């Protein structure tokens, strides 16, 4: 065990970077003493519960923590009531130290010597070193994200707009108003609208379209996949394998964190007035809509 730091140092001379997950840190580096690794780079830190990063950060001399607290928050399996009671027992501020309100990224922002402030509509938000230059999305996706999540402080640095073959077939990014009815959050009329859009792509001769179909709700994902199961000829015309394409291209917003596509079809679901709370949940705080919208590079429907 005494030789482990030297063995890892020898490996790092050959392979400068080793990739792992927080869950595997104990297995890979459990016997290393504190501050025995030179640099720790944490990606997607906004999704990590604070305690997950402790072991890795403890073993590093320096850490760079990169993430966005305004995208997908950490997933917490602990019941909310139990979480609240634990925080009360230990006399800690739940919003500051406990997920999902807190993440590895929010604590890194607090610890940073360098800070910046976002002036929000409701209170201000302090972050460490914000990455304000945005290089993925064209408008209107950039404007939506910039307005709802970043207090219009981001800088748009994307090249000329290229709607591509999908944009030419479906037209400009827009809201598709479906006055449908539903017994659950799944609205069959919205699903039919998605199928019609895919048929327009097939009619235009487009194959293997770079499209994500994203929804906030699991039941909508499941029913959209079932609906596409009956469109084998359509998927064949699009030049894709049904099961593989649905698995990779149709899903909830959590499925697409960190990914991007030419075009996103945002399938909202929950169309009835009595389901308004479900849509409000999907839009406030802005994390979920921010992630969905910012997956699209060129077109959003």
Where are the language model's segments positioned?
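Conserved helicase motor
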Residues: 22-27, 215-219, 249-256
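Short glycine-/polar-rich loops that comprise or flank the Walker A/P-loop
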Residues: 36-37, 59-62, 123-128, 170-173, ...
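Short mixed-charge
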Residues: 96, 116, 230-247
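Conserved RecA-like P-loop NTPase helicase motor core
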Residues: 73, 244-301
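Active-site glycine-centered loops adjacent to acidic/histidine catalytic or metal-binding residues
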Residues: 68, 213, 258
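Conserved helicase/translocase motor-coupling segment
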Residues: 146-232
